A protein has these predicted regions:
Chain B
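Membrane-interfacial amphipathic/re-entrant helices at transmembrane-helix boundaries
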Residues: 2-67, 102-115, 232
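Structural signal for alpha-helical transmembrane segments and their membrane-water exit/capping regions
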Residues: 32-48, 156-161, 197-204
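Cytosolic-side transmembrane-helix boundaries in multi-pass membrane proteins
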Residues: 1-38, 221-228, 300-339
Length: 258, 339
């Protein structure tokens, strides 16, 4: 056992099993993540990565198993519950509402209301949201010229910047990033990796899902490999190379033993 | 934090101000509306009489609530084909329920309030049926509301036996009273319309409506109770259709199964929304657009009659209007897209 195990994990999943109809997406999956640590979650298509993060974020509910945050057993009835517990998730390609402004997207589900009676009637304070959205993005190192612009008017890189900025700005404990470097150029990807490193410095627990193995090896402290819904390897990143990681993902170096 | 993500950010070319105004659907519609009024007035000077404007407001009021109902539904990414027959069935049911009160000479204000409540309840039930089929049985909105449309139209015929239900001359009398060209009935409808606009654009409820229509998954992942919201939207649409049923009851003094059905009010309402610049894929639409769309359709329908165009041609003109509006929207979307 490593030193890390003496600390309380900020997020722990115990024996998670999830079915979609008769298909078993996750089988007895247990993982722990700690503050100030970046975990790489890798696996082939259909290995269960997206299913696992949907269990973490409350989009899906596991058939059995436990979700434990800061030592407390939790049950998510909806994504709202996990967000309230300080867990933010960046979904692959689909986390933003393209027809809403950048500011509205940053505050989606957390709209600021006007003060007094109007606020109680549900009136939103759009001006304050646009202003604070700029500040929040700037705080995590992202500058966007005008937040009133709708997301549909942004380039792919800009959308990703807004999505990452939103997740990091709100995350208190855990941030889950599903393929954040997808569709990005080399330079933009490097910047995203820098944002991940600074999230770790802030003391967040980061769960990073990617098909880009060099990115995973560069930025993570520990790598969890999923195959066909099971955890097949959970080890410090230093124990992997691109080749051995690829072998573990595909299962090709199973017979040789690793 | 020290990291900079400037590399992720490339400046978006902003389009010229002139182009932005010209491609603004509401602005174009406003110009079209004024032009239409001037055109009809130039062809027939009687068009400018107070009486004709009063008629325009009244016809507009019969359309605007279901058009706004349709705006909420379409912005949320759905469609509601049921609003026309919901108006019919609620008018017929309410007319039957309140006729005993009319016969007993109960105060007209009480009768109309009870009738309004009854229409709202029947409308809510119709909207609830659509919502149930969509959220619990996963039917697509088009099919689910087609079911509600058929059930509503059928029940309206069954209940009314194809004849007007009830007779309330007091309601007709009241429907004509008001100040100048605005009757009390129209004034009430306009107040409801304004409230709907405020809720759509200034409140959290309206914001969720846009978010769900724009990207349902993003809305769900952001913690929005999507299912509950969609149920409320279809029920709201049903209530507004019910109120429209009551509107026509008050104007004619009876409930009729033909209300909103024979004139395909559901399609006219959708046309108003589309002309107003909303996107049928959801997430895009404006209250002002629908108001102007409904106004343009009202002025065209009434104005063509005024200059002796056969009513049969009106639908052709409406079709052309929808085509122009849709083309304008597609042009605007292309001009805004970032390469």
């Amino acid at each position: 056992m490593t030193i890390a195990s003496e600390r309380t994990p900020v997020l722990e999943l115990r024996n998670i099993t999830l079915h979609y109809g008769s298909v078993e997406a996750l089988h007895d999956v247990s993982i722990k993540s700690y503050a100030g640590e970046v975990i790489g979650l890798v696996g082939d298509n259909g290995a269960g990565k997206s299913s696992l993060i949907k269990v973490i974020s409350g989009v899906n509910t596991a058939d059995s198993g436990e979700v434990i945050v800061d030592g407390v057993r939790r049950h998510w009835r909806s994504p709202h519950d996990s967000m309230a517990a300080g867990i933010e998730t960046l979904y692959q390609d689909s986390g933003l509402a393209p027809d809403l402004s950048i500011g509205s997207n940053i505050f989606l589900g957390r709209e600021k209301r006007r003060s007094g009676l109007l606020g109680r009637l549900g009136f939103v304070d759009q001006r304050a949201m646009e202003k604070e959205a700029l500040e929040q993005l700037a705080r995590v190192g992202i500058t966007i010229p005008a937040t009133q612009r709708t997301v549909s008017e942004l380039s792919g890189g800009q959308r990703q910047a807004v999505a990452i900025g939103r997740a990091i700005a709100w995350a208190k404990h855990v941030i889950v990033l599903d393929e954040p470097t997808n569709h990005l150029g080399a330079r933009q990807s490097a910047e995203v990796l820098n944002v991940i490193k600074s999230a770790r410095e802030q003391g967040l627990s980061v769960i990073f899902i990617s098909h880009s193995l060099p990115h995973v090896l560069e930025v993570t402290d520990r790598i969890i490999v999923l195959r066909l819904g099971r955890v097949v390897r959970d080890a410090p990143t230093s124990e992997f190379t691109v080749e051995s990681l690829l072998g573990t993902i595909t299962g090709l170096n199973e017979s040789t033993g690793s | 934090m020290s990291t900079s993500v400037d590399a992720l950010v490339t400046t978006v070319k902003s389009q010229s101000r002139v182009r932005r105004v010209v491609t603004n659907q509401q602005f174009v519609l406003f110009v079209v509306l004024i032009a239409l009024i001037l055109f009809f007035a130039s062809r027939n000077s009687l068009f400018f009489r107070v009486g004709e404007f009063s008629n325009l407001f009244t016809d507009f009021s019969g359309l605007v609530l279901i058009a706004l109902a349709e705006t909420y539904v379409i912005v949320a990414g759905g469609i509601d084909l049921a609003v026309g027959s919901t108006a019919a069935v609620s008018g017929v049911v309410a007319a039957g329920w309140i006729q005993p009160l009319v016969n007993h000479g109960v105060n007209q204000a009480v009768i109309l309030l009870v009738g309004t409540l009854a229409c709202a309840v029947v409308g809510a039930l119709a909207g609830g049926l659509s919502a149930l089929l969509i959220t619990a049985f996963d039917l697509v909105p088009f099919v689910a509301t087609l079911v509600t449309y058929s059930v509503g139209a059928g029940l309206a015929l069954v209940i009314s036996h194809g004849a007007p239900v009830g007779y309330n001359p007091g309601a007709i009398y009241w429907s004509a009273s008001g100040i100048g060209m605005i009757t009390w009935l129209v004034a009430i409808v306009l107040v409801v319309a304004v409230v709907l606009g405020v809720v759509l654009h200034l409140t959290v409820y309206g914001r969720y409506n846009f978010a769900i229509g724009s990207n349902e998954f993003a809305a769900r992942a952001a913690g929005i109770a999507v299912r509950r919201h969609l149920i409320s939207v279809y029920v709201l649409a049903g209530v507004l259709a019910g109120l429209t049923g009551m509107f026509f009851y008050i104007r004619s003094g009876s409930g009729a199964a033909t209300t909103g059905v024979t004139n395909s009010a559901n399609l006219v309402a959708i046309a108003a929304v589309v002309i107003g610049g909303a996107s049928l894929t959801g997430g895009v639409g404006r209250w002002a657009g629908t108001m102007l769309g409904a106004a343009v359709l009202t002025v065209v329908s009434d104005g063509l009659i005024f200059i002796n165009v056969p009513p049969t041609w009106i639908q052709v003109v409406v079709g052309a209007l929808i085509a122009v509006a849709a083309l304008l929207q597609s042009f605007r979307r292309r001009s805004r897209r970032v390469p």
